[in-house]
């Protein structure tokens, strides 16, 4: 962090130094957190078009240039060369996994694909033509009531387990919402299938049986 800029009130002559924060990529950011105390003013930036609201070690985006990076990798490269769970592993742990690491990660995810039966009963309270996203949002929001052993955001292990759970269970919940709109019975996940194959099985198996 370095002080290369300052803001001056032309009416009073009072100046405030603005520290520049250099990111790994992209333009510098100015630390304006002391302006309200020193100058008695806020900044006005509708839509935060020129404001970085936080630091991120995961994502860099430049909409004007069409750039989207995850952990330094272009999103188009990840889409072309990596599977979903490889990218999920990258986002959580910071590096692309080795084969052994990916196998262990997939094993952990598959172990968490089942959803508590009482949680699935939530769908019985939704109308058959309810929007799937509304149903999924409601059920996901209720997960903390069933899996409350890993809700300490300050505990790295809790965050890791909950990340694995949400990656594993969200497709199961989404499939349940889809089946509910069709009036078809829920199809349980199969741990003998890979992650994406399981998603296809849960969505289409009942349709294929007719």
PLM regions and their residue ranges:
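Hydrophobic alpha-helical bundle cores within soluble ligand-binding/oligomerization subdomains
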Residues: 2-205
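Positively charged, low-complexity/disordered segments
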Residues: 206-210
């Amino acid at each position: 962090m370095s002080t290369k800029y300052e803001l001056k009130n032309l009416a009073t002559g009072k100046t405030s130094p603005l520290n520049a924060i250099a990111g790994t990529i992209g333009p510098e950011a100015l630390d304006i957190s002391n302006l309200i105390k020193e100058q008695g003013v806020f900044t006005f930036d509708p839509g935060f078009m020129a404001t970085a609201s936080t630091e991120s070690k995961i994502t860099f985006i430049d909409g004007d240039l069409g750039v989207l990076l995850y952990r330094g990798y272009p999103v188009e490269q990840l889409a072309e060369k990596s599977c979903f769970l490889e990218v999920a592993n990258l986002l959580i742990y910071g590096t692309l996994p080795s084969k052994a690491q990916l196998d262990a990660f997939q094993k952990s995810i598959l172990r968490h694909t089942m959803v508590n039966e009482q949680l699935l009963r939530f769908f019985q309270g939704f109308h058959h033509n309810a929007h799937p996203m509304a149903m999924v949002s409601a059920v996901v929001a209720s997960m903390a009531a069933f899996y409350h052993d890993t809700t300490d955001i300050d505990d790295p292990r809790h965050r890791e387990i909950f990340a694995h759970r949400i990656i594993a269970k969200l497709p199961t919940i989404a499939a349940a919402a889809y089946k509910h709109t069709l009036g078809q019975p829920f199809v349980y996940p199969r741990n003998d299938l890979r992650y994406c194959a399981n998603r296809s099985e849960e969505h289409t198996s009942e349709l294929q049986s007719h």
